[in-house]
Amino acid sequence: MPLLDSFTVDHTRMNAPAVRVAKTMQTPKGDTITVFDLRFTAPNKDILSERGIHTLEHLYAGFMRAHLNGSAVEIIDISPMGCRTGFYMSLIGTPSEQQVAEAWLAAMQDVLKVENQNKIPELNEYQCGTAAMHSLDEAKEIANAIIAAGISVNKNDELALPESMLQELKID
């Protein structure tokens, strides 16, 4: 099984909250797709609450689009990580980590402005697979924590696992 890019970086050294360019690739037509690791919490140290991350999933994608999309950037998808320490964001374009961090902070401010649970987009049984699993309060706690901490940048070259360690950790 091929080793995915996200598993070639040392999760014990990641800062959080932080932005990292996880991957860039070119489409056959020449567009650049950039995948960002938006790390909300330090891996293996903290975890986003189930209800909080689910509510953020509904809010964050729209708010990030409002702050980052433009003539040179179009967000394709923002999805929570299975480990519940952040989100992956795939987009067309190459915004800087700083631009992404600024949009992220603005999106967290937007989360704080959501008045009540009834204002969460697509929170119904027709558009959400687990409509009962939401908490606006927990999403706001996460947003407040991000704003208070600020957002740094994780660089792949600083986090790269040595090839010898990757071979040692490999499961055949």
Curated annotation (Swiss-Prot):
Its cofactor is Fe cation. Pfam families: LuxS. Gene3D superfamilies: S-ribosylhomocysteinase (LuxS). It is an enzyme of class 4 (lyase). Binds 1 Fe cation per subunit. It catalyses: S-(5-deoxy-D-ribos-5-yl)-L-homocysteine = (S)-4,5-dihydroxypentane-2,3-dione + L-homocysteine. The keyword Metal-binding applies. Keywords: Autoinducer synthesis, Iron, Lyase, Metal-binding, Quorum sensing. Homodimer. This is S-ribosylhomocysteine lyase. The gene is luxS.
